[in-house]
C-alpha cells in the first residue's frame, strides 16, 4: 500500500512523461471532469449498497406480479391528456414502469422488439416518428436521489404519496429514509392490493399504509404530511376540471412548512390548466435546493435537479 507522499511523487513523475504540455493538460482536464467523479460515484458506502439490493429485490418481486412492462392493470381508466403541450396520446406514447424496469431492462426489451420505439403517422406508408416513452412511477435511482439527497433527514416525519400506484415511492421511502409514517393514497384497488401484498412480503407494513380512496374524500391526510410526493399524478387519470379541483384541494390543505416533491415542476403542471388552476405559486410555495447534495454524485445531482423539483409550502 502506498502512502500519500509516495503517491504524490509518483504522480508528479508520471506527469513529467507526457510528450507535450498540451497532452498533460488534456489528461488533467479528463481527470478533473470525468475520472474523479466516476471514481467517487463507484465508491459506494456499504449501507447504500445494502439499500439498493433491498429495493431491487422489492422491484423484482413487484415486476413478477404485474403482467406487462407498463405497470398498468385492466381496471385502470387512463385518459390521454387533452392539455398536453407535447401532444401525447395512446398512439405516440409508450408507457414503461421505471420502478419495475431500469434503463438496462428497457434497452433489452427494446432490442427484443417488445417495446416499440416508433409509431406510424400514416398507416401503410414510411411516415414514422419516434415514440415518446413515459412512466407513472419513479425509478429506483430517482427514489435514491429523493430520499438520500433531495430531502432532509425524515426521522419522525410523515410522507404522503398521492397516486401511489404499485408503491414505488412508499418502498423507496421505507428503505432510503427513517420516516415514521409513509402514506400512499391510490384510487385503483388492484394497485392497492399489490402494494399491500408487497409490504407484507418484505415486512414494510408497520410504517407503510396504503389508502384505497380518491384524494377528495381523504383531505385530512394532506394536513398530516410533512412531505407530499406528486409524480406525474393527474394528467393521465383525471379530466381537466377534476385536475383543477384536486390541485385546489392540495393548495388549501397542505400545511405550512411541508415539502412538495414534484415531477414535473409545479410551473409546468399548472401552466396547462385553465388560469393555472387559480393558484399563485409565488404566494403558495418557495423552490428549494437539495438538502443533502453531498450524499449523491455530481452527475446524478445535475441530472435529477432538472427533472425532480422541491418546494416548501409558505
Regions found by a protein language model. Name each.
Residues 1-136, 264, 271, 277-279, ...:
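Intrinsically disordered, low-complexity glycine/charged-rich regulatory or linker segments
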Residues 115-120, 133-156:
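Conserved alpha-helix/loop element of class I SAM-dependent methyltransferases that forms part
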Residues 181-186:
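Conserved SAM-binding motif I beta-strand of class I
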Residues 187-314:
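Domain-level detector for long C-terminal conserved domains
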